[in-house]
Amino acid sequence: MEELLAQYSFLQVEYIDAIDGRMMSKAEISDRFDLYSCMRHNGRELNRGEIGCALSHRKALRKLKDSSLDYALILEDDVSIIRNLNELGGYGIDNILSTDRPTVLLLSGDYWYFKKAAVVTCYDAIGAYAYFINRAAANLILSIGKPFTVADDWFMFKRMGLHIKAIRPYMVDANLNMEQLSSDVKQEHWGFDRRRMSKTRAVLSYFPAIIKRLLKFIGHYESKYHVLYGKVIGK
């Protein structure tokens, strides 16, 4: 990661030790993560990798909250940069993020959006491995005293008042190397199980799914590439 970011001198890089959910005891997880609300919201238990990921992102958000910065770029350590980040200067990042409106700006793909533009407004998105977030958004997410969902539950955060923007075409992808594939955060665990949700939540979850299908049908979905060891292998 250090070598990857060294070419971008405009970034002031700070590394944060991730929280490994696999090393946490059941008591530690119960103390820091709301398992009951998680089941009602997602209809399933999160695995330890997902819990550790959610707690790690909150740790990064607290760093931003306690700093004097207006916003920060959060990158996970297994990403591949597929477009030159020096191009960010042409997107008006300061204008987008230097605001009291809770805002995130995704550099990743896998998002649904309304109107085609260089910077789009998202309906929903998947992934939390590369995004700008401003102080207001960090405060908004941290206002959930005890987390109960995944780090990239952007739709829930949007319902709380978060504005989700994204750069199109996207700039950063998750690197599907063998270390990631064998990690505790695996694709088969993503999503939710309506059968085990609260009834209200289960019913309401159908509407966003329909909207996303329609947006994808009309070409308003930014599909991501597949990257293996830093090389694009398909889409």
Predicted feature residues:
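An acidic/histidine-cluster motif and surrounding catalytic segment
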Residues: 1-75, 79-235
